[in-house]
């Protein structure tokens, strides 16, 4: 049964994450970035200053969570497993060149996340408690010209979002934590799973307000720890940095890798694994979306709150 499920998931991965979706994500991001005249990049310093002002931490009654809490809620999904496990798997499967495409998808994805967040704020509504609620499902339902089609698409998005929350939203993180604790401290994976479930339930039952309060204190600590850890790795391996950059650029732009050939776009063999420019792009962009969530619509849900 496990083998059958694995084959089914692999087949779905080949169909969904085909070349068409890779170019659709990058193409949409490039189109929006050019249409906005690089607004996400030009206004990034001003946006950061505004978010970290003292006023940004104060929520207004009836207007949802504060700007800073909204930011930390979104960052909670992007700092962590996606930037650690996602990067590692991208390199193993796609080679060093995958890191370039992960970085590029993150930069281009700024425009995608800006537009989806703006739309979600524009079409958000008030729930029964008088609190703002929004997301792509509300955009599809209220902004789509054909109302019936809009409602159907909204329901489909909500259903797929729930399914995604079990996979990339929970299982990947839970498995990474359980595996790390099991290997390092010999903690049983079942115990870790139960503890994570209980802690998650306590936070979720409080609604978006409780989630925002938890992330407001937790995410800054995560960010500092993550940046400190990556900084230490770079510092201790600084002499290998130039060679690493060369490998990343070569893996992403090697002409032989991008044009392909009888060898199936072979670039290099590392530890018995054949890497190619096409594989680097595929795994770099797909793991990049897992990390930055640009195009998934999740950013708009927290922004609308």
Per-region residue spans from a language model:
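Membrane helical hairpin/interfacial module
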Residues: 88, 95-108, 115-116
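N-terminal alpha-helical transmembrane segments of multi-pass membrane transport
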Residues: 1-81, 91-98, 109
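Membrane-interface loop-to-helix entry segments
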Residues: 24-28, 35-48, 157, 174-181, ...
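Alpha-helical membrane segments and immediately flanking helix-loop junctions
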Residues: 59-93, 119-137, 141-143, 159-162, ...
């Amino acid at each position: 049964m496990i083998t059958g499920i694995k084959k089914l998931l692999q087949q779905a991965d080949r169909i969904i994450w085909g070349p068409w979706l890779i170019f659709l994500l990058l193409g949409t991001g490039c189109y929006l970035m050019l249409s906005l005249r690089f607004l996400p990049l030009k206004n990034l310093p001003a946006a950061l200053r505004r978010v970290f002002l003292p006023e940004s931490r104060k929520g207004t009654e009836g207007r949802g969570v504060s700007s800073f809490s909204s930011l930390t809620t979104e960052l909670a999904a992007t700092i962590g497993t996606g930037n650690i496990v996602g990067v590692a798997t991208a390199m193993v499967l796609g080679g060093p060149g995958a890191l370039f495409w992960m970085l590029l998808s993150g930069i281009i994805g700024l425009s995608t996340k800006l537009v989806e967040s703006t739309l979600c704020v524009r079409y958000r509504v008030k729930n029964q408690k008088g609190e703002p609620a929004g997301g792509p499902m509300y955009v599809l339902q209220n902004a789509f010209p054909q109302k019936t089609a809009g409602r159907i698409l909204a329901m489909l998005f909500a259903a797929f979002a729930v399914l995604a929350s079990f996979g990339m939203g929970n299982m990947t993180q839970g498995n990474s934590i359980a595996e790390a604790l099991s290997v390092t401290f010999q903690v049983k994976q079942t115990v870790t799973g139960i503890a994570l479930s209980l802690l998650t339930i306590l936070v979720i039952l409080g609604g978006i307000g409780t989630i925002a309060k938890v992330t407001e204190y937790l995410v800054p600590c995560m960010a500092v720890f993550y940046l400190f850890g990556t900084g230490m790795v770079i510092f201790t391996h600084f002499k290998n940095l130039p060679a690493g950059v060369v490998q990343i650029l070569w893996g992403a732009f090697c002409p032989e890798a991008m044009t392909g050939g009888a060898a199936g776009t072979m670039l290099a063999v590392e530890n018995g694994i054949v890497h190619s420019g096409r594989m680097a792009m595929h795994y770099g962009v797909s793991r990049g979306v897992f990390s930055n969530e640009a195009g998934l619509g999740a950013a708009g849900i927290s922004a609308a709150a």
